Amino acid sequence: MTTNSHTLHLEEILELLPHRFPFLLVDRVIDFKKWQFLYAIKNVSYNEPFFQGHFPGKPIFPGVLILEAMAQATGILAFKSAGKLDSSELYYFAAIDNARFKRPVQPGDQMILEVKFIKERRGVARFKGVTTVDGEVACEALMMCARRQ
């Protein structure tokens, strides 16, 4: 279903990530280059279950879930860069530093998730993540994921 070798659709994302509804937060990968970068999309719908309580009358996409979406994007880039893992291995979200939230994300927005590979050592990879909406930075952070059984 891929239109080119740098695009991943839902079926391919589901093969890489263990996350499922309602916690899969990457809709499509629009471009990537192994060991360098990945761009992905998360379309924000009012139908997301957390909008019932966050916040009634003023729905805001939770910041921690923006971070989780970027972490899932780093996992996809790590899997695509390192190749298929042993069936007992996963990439775990290991750390986050310097997280900043710059603008709210609301229903109807489309988040562009950008993650850039910084370095990898002994199964721990470091990335910089930036999420934008309409060209404006909504969130940025440094993240690490660890390859473990």
Curated annotation (Swiss-Prot):
Compartments where located: Cytoplasm
Coiled coil: none
Entry keyword Hydrolase: no
SUPFAM superfamilies in the record: Thioesterase/thiol ester dehydrase-isomerase (SSF54637)
Signal sequence interval, chain numbering: none
Protein family (similarity comment): Belongs to the thioester dehydratase family. FabZ subfamily.
The protein's name in its UniProt record: 3-hydroxyacyl-[acyl-carrier-protein] dehydratase FabZ
Gene that this polypeptide is encoded by: fabZ
